[in-house]
Structures are given as C-alpha cells and as structure tokens.
Amino acid sequence: MDGKTILPCSEVPEEFTWDLSDVFASDDKWSEELEALKAYPERMAAYAGKLGESAKTLLDWFTLSDEITVRVSKFVQYASCRSDQDVGNSFYQGMRSKAFSMSVALNSAGSFEASEIMAIPDETLARFYAEEPKLETYRRSIDKLRRRKAHILSPECEKILAAAGEISESPDRTFSMFHNADMRYPDVTDAKGEVHTLTDGTFVPMLMSADRTLRENAFKAYYKRAGEFRNTYASTLDAQFKQLKFFADARHYNSTLEASLDVTEVPVEVYTNLIDAVHGNLDKMYRYVELRKKILGVDELHMYDVYTPIVADADVEISFEEAKKTALEALAVLGRDYTDVLEEAFSNRWLDVYENTGKRGGAYCTGNGWPHPYVLLNHKDNLDSMFTLVHEMGHAMHTWHSCKYQPVNTAEYVIFVAEVASTCNEILLMRHLLGKTDDRKQRAYLINHFLDQFKGTLYRQTMFAEFELQMGKMAESGEALTADALSAKYLALNKLYFGDTMISDDEIALEWTRIPHFYYNYYVFQYATSFSAAVAIANRILREGESAVRDYKKFLSGGCSKEPVELLRDMGVDMRTPAPVNDALSLFGELIDELSALLG
C-alpha cells in the first residue's frame, strides 16, 4: 500500500493499522470494563468529607485515584482510537460517547478532592507527610491543587462544573463530526484536465503540487465549499469560546487565556511575549515571502503558492518504509535505548498509517502510555509526512518515558512541554538530512522545507494564537463570533503576517473554518514556543552529545514533576524571556540568506 490510495477502512492491510488488543482484546472486553468502572463512583463517594481526617485516608484516596486514572485512560484511549479509524461508524461513535460520559461521571464523583485538599491546614498537612512517607509521591499534585486555591469552588459547585465537562466538549465534537465525517468537496482538475479527489486530507498535498492550476483550483474549491457552511463553523467556535468564558468566570479568572494557561502553570506573559517577539521579527517573514515570489517567478504570489516547494524538481517520493528508516538514522543521536523503543512501536503496530475513507484527518499521538501510546497518521509518501512521523513519534517517546519513569500522578506532562519533544525530533531530522548532502538543489529544497517549518510553526501558529486571543476577547466583551466578524479579523491578521508582497486572497479569510486546534483551549501558541525551545535543545544535543542527551532524557521522563517552564530551564531554555524566540528567528534569517545564495 502507498500514500496515494484511499481505501475503505475495512480494506486497509492490517499491518498499517493499530493493534488495539494491547489495550483490550476485543470490543466485548471493553464493554466489560465499562460495567466494572461503574462501581468506582460509590467507592469514591466513601472518601467524601474525609480526606483531611488522616494521612492514611489521604494516601488511600490517591492510591485509588491512580488506579482509576490508568483504567479510565485505557478505556477512553480504546474507544477514541476505534472511532477515529472510522468517524462515520455509529457503533464506535457511541462507544466514544460512552467513554467520555464515564470519564465525566468519574471526574464528577471525585470533584470533592480539590476543595477538601484546599481545606487541610498547613500544619495538618505537614503532620501527614511526617506520619506517612508515601504521601511524598503526591506532594507535587497536592501543591498544584493548593496553588489554585482562589479558583477552586465549594464541593457542590465543583460537582456541577465537573458534570458540565461533557457539555464543554460539544463544540469540538460537533466540529470534528461535521468537518471529518459530513463535509464533502468537489473534484478538481489540474493543468492537463486530469481529475483529482479533493478531501480534507488531500487539500494540503494538492497545495504542495508543482501544478499551479491544481493548487488554485483546489484552494478555491475547498474554501468555496467551506464558505457554504461558514455560519455553522462560526456557531461551533462561538459555542467553544462561550464555554471557555463560562468556566473562566466561574473560577474567577480575569480572562479565558489566564484560565486556560493557569491549569498548566504557564504565565500569561509567555503567550503575549511570543506575539510581541514575532511582531518584532515580521521583517524576516516579509523577506521570505519576497524570496519565494522571486524563485517561483510569478507576477503575483497568492496564498495557494505558499506550500509548493521552491525547488520543484527536487521533490521526492518517500515511502513509509523509507521514512521509518530515515527517522531511526536521524534519531540515533539520542541513543540506542531511544531507537529500540521506536523500532518496537513500528513492529508492534502502535501506528495507524494511511488515510482511508472515514478516518479522522491530521495526525496525533494519544496521551496515554499505559501500556503504550498510539499514533494516528495520514501518510502521503512525501517529505512533509516523514516530518509528521518523527513529530508524532516525539510525542510517543515523551509519553512512553514519562509513564515509565514517573508515578501515575505526575506522568502526564502538560501541553506546553508536549510540543518540545516532537519538534526537537523534526529539527534533528532536518539537521540529519542537511548533513547528508552537498548537492545545491537538494540543500535548497531541504532549507526551503526548514523555512516552511518556521513559517508554518513559528509564524503561522503565532498568528493562530493571536486570532484565538482576539476570539477570546470578543467572547469576554459579549460580542458574537459571527462568520463575517471572524473572517474580517482573520484576513487582517493574514495580511499583517504575510505582508504586502503576498496577495491575501479573499478565500483565505475562511481558513479559520478548517483549524481543529481552535477547539483546544489556547493550544497552538505552544507549537511556536516549543519550536523555539526545540531549536535550542537540538543545537545543544548536536553540539554537546552525551551530556545533553542525558539531560534531554531527564526532560522526557519529567512528566509534570516540575512546572513546565522549570523543566525547560533545566535544559538551558528560559521561555519567560524573548531570547529563545529571537534566537530561532535569527536562524530563520540566516537560512533565508543561505537559500538565496544557493539559488542565485
């Protein structure tokens, strides 16, 4: 099989699909677990009002919580993976719904935890630690809860908010079902008149084509179709930010941004400093756009011209087998123990590889490492897909290390550091590929791809982050997120970030309709901060070798054992300053100069 053929999910060869039997042997076993999990709320209720009674009671509660965490994580993981393999399958969608309902029910059953732990006097808690040394394992979790004391409500209110958790997932679920399962796009033709199937999964690969007619036709057809449903898309985003505002207000935060970042202990200034730093380096982006226009030799550079490789004849087809081999070579610098786990993942079907009819688009790694993570891909046999592979395996290795070396309560790393490991893998792959060739055209092609990573990850994700911030402010001021308002704001940002050399086509005003991360609660800025941190970390690994690798594996194994900014500081990267962003964008400028010299 290759990345060009789109089959029904039932016809995809087994070797390219997940082996979910590592989690549950069958759907029936999953159903048995559903019944078993129903016993937990009663067991949890027995601890209500008692967490401050004794050290033993508190330890017993945390032990039970760990047990539930592992079982529920596996339970949700299995159902989510099943439903994402075929989003149109009503049985698996029902399974997913049951899984999330159970997760919400258990969260609700344990909602008294935060307020009760908050209420334990400092001197009593100190005595508990002295009486029961095993409680030290949970000190970090306890400290995180008590840090947010001003935002934790009464047990009754916490139970209501926990029960509302399922409702808060509705905008994301509705968008995902509509966008992935229900949306259909017209076929498009290339310069030769050949017909191509346009899907959400084939859209970007078409924009990467050297055929400008195909790029333009795909671009216009995709957004024409999206425009027909722009009010539906706007409605789901409006609901998303209204639910964020509801929870932020309920917990007495000043903004939806503050509420979202506080959960992961990231200072708000990290977010705003990123936007300011990128604004201060937009001149480099404008230089990149001008160079792209010059090399492509077009009178006007349009938004459908931003993905196609500048050195078109250097574009190569990379099979999944070749992508795996190259990934192992590039990441060998991280040690044999690292690549051994990668090989295990490849051999034991931790990955669902190719796009198929009804499969969820994009790529992701599940956040559960018990027994191991799973990775979803939509591999297209190109360079971008190879980078996606190492990116998602970076997530997988981060999850695997944290779940292996951290206790359950500190195994789940926060989003802010999640993208560092994945992006570091991408940087190491790029350095590996550049180190293998002196060919001017091949180097130019790779550097162009590297520059596109800067554009797509640092600049583009910061633009998304700024758009999210604008949506949050709209919701906070009571302004409705209408399709017209969103499109106007998005088009203005696109013009700011790409500059006057780029034609910001009217269609691009609707790009917000296709971005799933806008439903992830201020997630995307972390791609940009992580990219900046990853550049610094990868450079240190390549420069210092074993000592840096040793520190890096401590980072991978750190889970949430420290605040995320502190985990990065241990690697020598301080994201509370603009230095990492400025340094990364300085490299961007140097790469522009090198590409310009290579291509004359």
Regions found by a protein language model. Give the residues of each.
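His/Asp/Glu-rich acidic catalytic environments and adjacent acidic regulatory segments
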Residues: 1-50, 70, 74-269, 273, ...
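C-terminal, non-catalytic "cap/extension" segments appended to globular domains
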Residues: 10-14, 25, 113, 117, ...
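Active-site recognition of the HExxH zinc-binding catalytic motif
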Residues: 252, 380-400, 422, 427, ...
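Long, K/E/R/D-enriched contiguous segments that form extended
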Residues: 295-339, 374-375, 398, 445, ...
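Short pre-active-site segment immediately N-terminal to the catalytic Zn-binding motif
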Residues: 316-320, 368-390
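Catalytic zinc-binding patch centered on the HExxH motif and its immediate surroundings
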Residues: 316-318, 351-371
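Conserved helix-loop functional segments at active or binding sites
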Residues: 329, 333-340, 366, 395, ...
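Post-HExxH zinc-binding segment in Zn-dependent metallohydrolases
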Residues: 413-442, 450-452, 456, 530
